[in-house]
């Protein structure tokens, strides 16, 4: 909220750091915290999770293991009431009620209906898939690609070069998606191509902007200051997938 200039929270929204208050007597809990903190938060939530539905808005993978958020959660909490939501939009677009589309990945029909009821309106469209792994993978990997796309932009290379890179990336992502037991078709969803297109071209994208700083030969102090003050999800995902590829002896050109 602090990064959204001039935005005032509605009176119906309460800010709290009390995990019990967040979880108790809720139908739906939306999880939108950096991946590196997820395990600790889930451990705190565990005593209070009974029949609640969980919707993951976090984009990333667990360091060292490459586990997705839904795997991290279900390893600690015995539930099938879980979904992942991802797609091409920024927080400010949601606030301004810009027409947007998101992919919803879940295998639980009741969870699907609960999330639809909470999110769907005149300006937000949800497309549902059972491929929760694919939705999460696309949401994570696009941040890595966005850093590289930003570097291309920072080096003032032609738009056609960036278009070639994004196209090649789509091919590599579809191959990786299959390795992670996702559905290749998910690459064509809001979570896949839609989010990749936005994140690789918009200056609002933190990962794209970070890559652009690197590509433009900004000094090390400027780059480090940006990294410290901004969540660059792609950096964590890059480390995780790179290690996974080395361990499994998988050729991953976009990561290398």
State where each predicted segment sits.
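Electropositive phosphate-/nucleotide-binding environments in soluble metabolic enzymes
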Residues: 16, 32-35, 39, 48, ...
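Rossmann-like NAD(P)(H) cofactor-binding subdomain of soluble oxidoreductases
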Residues: 9-10, 16-24, 28-99, 115-117
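Short, well-ordered beta-strand core segments
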Residues: 29, 54, 102-103, 125, ...
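Glycine-rich phosphate-binding loop and adjoining beta1-alpha1-beta2 segment
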Residues: 1-8
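Alpha-helix C-terminal capping/helix-to-coil transition sites in glycosyltransferase folds
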Residues: 24-25, 141, 193
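Internal alpha-helical scaffold of NAD(P)-dependent oxidoreductase catalytic cores
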Residues: 37, 48, 75-80, 99-185
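NAD(P)-dependent Rossmann-like dehydrogenase/reductase catalytic/cofactor-binding core
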Residues: 149-153, 178-188, 192-256
